[in-house]
Amino acid sequence: MTHLKLGTGVCAITMLLLGVACGDDEESRPPGTITQTGSGGTSTGGGTSTGTTPTGTAGGGVGGGASGGIAQNYPGDVGIENDPDVIFADDFESYGQASDLWDRWDNTFQQNQTRIARETENVYAGDQAVEFNLPAQNQELSNAVVKVLTVEQDSMYLRWYSKFDTLNDIVGSSHNGGGMSAHYDSGPGVPADGTNHFLVLFEHWRGEATMAAPGEMNVYVYHPEQRDVWGDHFFPSGKVLPNTSLPFDFGPDFQPGTDVIPELGRWYCYELMVRANTPQQRDGRITLWLDGSLLADFGNLRFRDVDTLKINQFELSFHAHNVPVETKKYYDAVVAAKSYIGPMVPP
């Protein structure tokens, strides 16, 4: 596991819309080659075996990305919303208060725990970002913003900047990142069957207090081959929760990488690509980038058995079952697009 120090720079109604599981789930640099090194591989007994760290450019064909990305043409992300491949972009600069998020997002939750942040240290770019707060309590709570797509997509890229505050000490179920889903109307605890829904969230998992907060980066996935009624967690090393002793076949081109824990209090650039498979083929894919470097590339995936099941929304969230100390998470500079976006280029 690597403690990465890069860059500077969901429950009831929310469960229904975001598809986060609320049960006992085991739960900026320019583009370039990945810099982490270490062990990786498919877990065969609760740990990770040795293996090769993934390499490759941030775009360069991985996950269908184009080298460099959309953002390189829009320094400071200025005008990026006008790019023909961009579906949505929000720098959070237009909001006077949290209730104004309804102007551009289709759903927001826990507005009494949501704030437009203006402190310099809590904004990645410009003058504002969005802040989600989780108060100290032993009851489940989810903050989120959700965008419903006008045109559903077979594949999509989602990039955002985010940081945890330094007080985060959450252990166990917590959905704390961004992601996308296809018609997750039935809510969590209903397995994907190839026709009803799928969901992918790029987040962090901390199963034990002995692990550093906020836990290891992973994708939380509802797919037809999931191992429980709750979603699976795919880690860059190839480890899959639950049942880590059971390998998962990510295809012959999968290169096990390093399971990464980000540093609290630092901004990171996260990017997620989801490509739904062709029905009756295993060509679905999930690709993750961190600060423009490839973090994980999961292939050989099956999300659907019918081509009418497409991505119809994306979200940013901060959810937990049990919060020992009040903690906050910040988001800024979110872009959804049809091709690789990449980190923001300085203006």
Give the label of every model feature segment.
Residues A98-A129:
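Extracellular glycan-recognition surfaces and repeat-rich motifs
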Residues F92, G265-L301:
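Carbohydrate-binding surfaces in secreted/extracellular proteins
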Residues F109, V123-S245, V335-M344:
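Secretory/extracellular carbohydrate-interaction modules
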Residues F298-D332:
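Flexible glycan-contacting loops in extracellular carbohydrate-active proteins
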Residues G63-N107, V200, P347:
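Extracellular carbohydrate-recognition regions
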Residues L18-G69:
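Ser/Thr-rich, Pro/Gly/Ala-heavy low-complexity intrinsically disordered linkers and tails
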Residues R282-T287, N322-A333, P346:
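Extracellular carbohydrate recognition
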Residues Q153-S155, Y161, Q255-M273, D283:
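Trp-centered recognition loops
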